[in-house]
């Protein structure tokens, strides 16, 4: 299936992204921008921002839509990773940093302690930086979630990814209701934290199902949602079922904000979980907690 014109992006210029890429290489840090082949890497790197991928790059799950490598081997966490991440945040002068991780189902706490260590190092090196975490479901271990939230992130993101009908195909190791419960627990237990989720379209869902998911997310007290076009990483991954028009993405945004009451819905073909994540600082000023 040929990509429509609105999904064509210019290849990033080496000189525009080189400084960020070189720094990440120097500090031996992974980014989801690189590991997941994000189409916005040129724009984000050129703006001096990145979404850090910790505890990776290998993931203990093999979701058929994802471009991150599968690795079921048990690996020790790198105790120097949080300090290196804090240094990168300081050297890049980031005002808002996003930290995500691969799934680490091999760890007793799912990697919660590493998230907290990263928060502590960023706050030590760059106290004015707001912090967003994009976390896995921790296999429903709510003690692990509580451990992460004890670090007091400004934003907690957990992606719902797709509509419930497609979970067996796209997220066979995840449970739709469990993801909703995680998001609701964040808002109920830590009401000052802004909650966020995201989903892809183009996997076989209908527009009506997308709206139903948005309604579910709002009922579970989610504040911010991202919606973007699924792009298959390769022939071994799930194929694209459809390309959603920019007009329909705008309709999702409009309904989500005006009818369902989200603080923000970022919905464009090239939107990804952390795309324009720094805008959350404006939302925090407009809707203080």
From Swiss-Prot:
Subcellular locations according to the entry: Cytoplasm
Keyword tags: 4Fe-4S, Cytoplasm, Iron, Iron-sulfur, Metal-binding, S-adenosyl-L-methionine, Transferase
Recorded GO CC terms: cytoplasm
Short name of one Pfam family: Radical_SAM
InterPro entries: Aldolase_TIM (IPR013785), Elp3/MiaA/NifB-like_rSAM (IPR006638), Lipoyl_synth (IPR003698), rSAM (IPR007197)
The reaction(s) this protein catalyses: [[Fe-S] cluster scaffold protein carrying a second [4Fe-4S](2+) cluster] + N(6)-octanoyl-L-lysyl-[protein] + 2 oxidized [2Fe-2S]-[ferredoxin] + 2 S-adenosyl-L-methionine + 4 H(+) = [[Fe-S] cluster scaffold protein] + N(6)-[(R)-dihydrolipoyl]-L-lysyl-[protein] + 4 Fe(3+) + 2 hydrogen sulfide + 2 5'-deoxyadenosine + 2 L-methionine + 2 reduced [2Fe-2S]-[ferredoxin]
Presence of keyword Protein transport: no
Annotated positions binding [4Fe-4S] cluster 2: 59, 63, 66
Family matches, as SMART domains: Elp3
Protein name according to UniProt: Lipoyl synthase
Protein's gene: lipA
